[in-house]
Amino acid sequence: MTTQPRKILVTCALPYANGAIHLGHMLEHIQADIWVRFQRMRGNKIHFVCADDAHGTPIMLNADKLGITPEELIAKAKADHIRDFAGFNISFDNYHSTHSEENKQLTAEIYNKLKANGFIKSKVISQLFDPEKNMFLPDRFVKGTCPKCKAEDQYGDNCEVCASTYSPMDLINPRSAVSGTTPIVKESEHFFFDLPAFEGMLKEWTRSGSLQSEIANKMQEWFESGLQQWDISRDAPYFGFEIPGAKDKFFYVWLDAPIGYMASFKNLCNREGIDFNEFWAEGSDAELYHFIGKDIVYFHSLFWPAMLEGSGYRKPTNVFAHGYVTVDGAKMSKSRGTFIQASTYLNHIDPECLRYYYAAKLNDRIEDLDFNLDDFVQRVNTDIVNKLVNLASRNAGFIAKRFESKLADKLEDESLFAEFTAQAEQIAAYYESREYNKAIREIMALTDKANKYIDEKAPWVIAKEEGKEAELQAVCSMGIELFRVLMSYLKPVLPKLAERAEAFLQAELRWDNIHQPLLGHTLAPFKALFSRLEKKQIDAVVEETKALFAAANKAAEKTEAKPTALSAVEPIAETITIDDFAKLDMRVAKVLKCEAVPESNKLLRFELDLGDHTRQVFSGIKAAYNKPEELEGRFVIMVANLAPRKMKFGVSEGMILSAGTGGSDLFLLSADNGVTAGMQVK
């Protein structure tokens, strides 16, 4: 019985058209590309699309700063992004832009359907307005003093120091981050998407069993906190699409951005005669998968499926989220030269090296991946050069010189060949489930067996003995056959190396012919397949990255007033009485669990043991601790009698104490050995 090919549409999250592609982006695009290439090898009908996310206030302001139009800015960004993705052999069928006619039409259509179905509400809201720039200010473009802890220079939506969330109008001494002027309050009518109306559907979708467990668990927390109506409009001036029938109102970038998936596919359909509705219509039997980072799970697991449901389109089959990239155990850093742009990497290192390294560490869970530079060099050279490519080179010479490049007519060890090909379905299952680390581990175990076989047979010894020509040909042919099987398994990960291997083998590497040996087959002359990775190449990438950002900082200093340096020590606050201090109940707490809040750039969620009970506390120290799980088991100091605060992501039942100026410059306070959970700090 022949199985019908699956119909699959795959997307990656849309890179923002206001910056360069870096190695953090590449994790997702390599992960998706490996999966797509595997599906193609399996004979499935698959389309792979992406686009630039090209709207929003930051793009409008950056273009103005550069003295160009937003259209010019996003055109250059798109060209740069396409170049970088091509450099890493990302095999998109289409790469488009959200600033397109297809996206404009689809966004208007979906909005009108949502409105007709009663899912769009309107209400007048008060916002901060920059009178100098004549524009309403998004939360992130307002700064001031936190109304809760009085920390200065905080954003308009939440405090990095105490993790409080608030309205921009609650800020003390607010100022526009665009012009520096003091904003005024103005009213404006805004449009809202009625997300709570879809809670039942979203809960059912969550329980379907297809979502990653981490996403399903996080969605349950959001349900418990209560879904809120979503503001989908922005006031002029704004770079984006105008809302039909609403003068000077524009769609918020996060409304039209995911519709960009549909628009990019629509563009491909129009060009190649593909049936758009076959993949997007309600009830479609096609599969739809979104590969995304953990920071945008909120939009893709709540707003996006609800928008599709409300406008009569199908929902995603699944959303595959991944973690962040760290370098040498720390957050990517511009000053240390580890915030590596894709173009900088490509100037010095083969992209296949990174594809392999990421694949060797990627799994199906939402975990951060550490790009360890020393381990990178060692793993690439050990696995690809010393083991895999060496298997071909150490046998190809004998076949070429002694047998006119012709392989033997039969297998020297049929049972060993069968052992290798028997792993095809298990390795396929690992690729299918995105457990690439397990696939690589299995493939490398086979590679070790292949090299052990050659070591034991020692063709270099056989070659010196008369009358053993047939044995020499059989052994070396067996080595080449095993290399062919291994390269077939690695083709989704190393497409360019696979191309060179196919040229040498003069045979296509396909999943459906893995079991068919190249008996009596003639090889092409062997050429070097892969070069060793040298430490000096890594050093060159790091140094170029440092120089790149040093030059950018120097240019910024010429165009912007240098900010006043922070004093070495913050001034002492106003005097309080002993009675004031006595009101604080500070306790030692043990961290039972600590995790990042995916939809927040600042917050970590702590589960704390206070001796006789546990509490949940949110703390805005995410930038300082990019491996929150390492805080588990540690003792911290907290204010235990602070009134609970209901936040967007749950209730925070206290405040964890830390020292520093904010951002990555924060350090948790701890106690000496011997303390126990619940002890009072005196």
From Swiss-Prot:
Gene designation: metG
Keywords in alphabetical order: Aminoacyl-tRNA synthetase, ATP-binding, Cytoplasm, Ligase, Metal-binding, Nucleotide-binding, Protein biosynthesis, RNA-binding, tRNA-binding, Zinc
Organism from which the protein derives: Haemophilus influenzae (strain PittGG)
Subcellular location: Cytoplasm
Motif ('HIGH' region): 15-25
Residues holding Zn(2+): 146, 149, 159, 162
GO CC annotations on file: cytosol
Family matches, as Pfam families: Anticodon_3, tRNA-synt_1g, tRNA_bind
Cofactor note: Binds 1 zinc ion per subunit.
EC number: 6.1.1.10
Intervals of motif 'KMSKS' region: 331-335
Purpose: Is required not only for elongation of protein synthesis but also for the initiation of all mRNA translation through initiator tRNA(fMet) aminoacylation.
Quaternary organization: Homodimer.
Binding residues for ATP: 334
Top-rank lineage group of the source organism: Bacteria
HAMAP family for the chain: Met_tRNA_synth_type1
Keyword Protein biosynthesis: yes
Residue ranges constituting the tRNA-binding domain according to the UniProt record: 580-682
Sequence similarity: Belongs to the class-I aminoacyl-tRNA synthetase family. MetG type 1 subfamily.
Protein name: Methionine--tRNA ligase
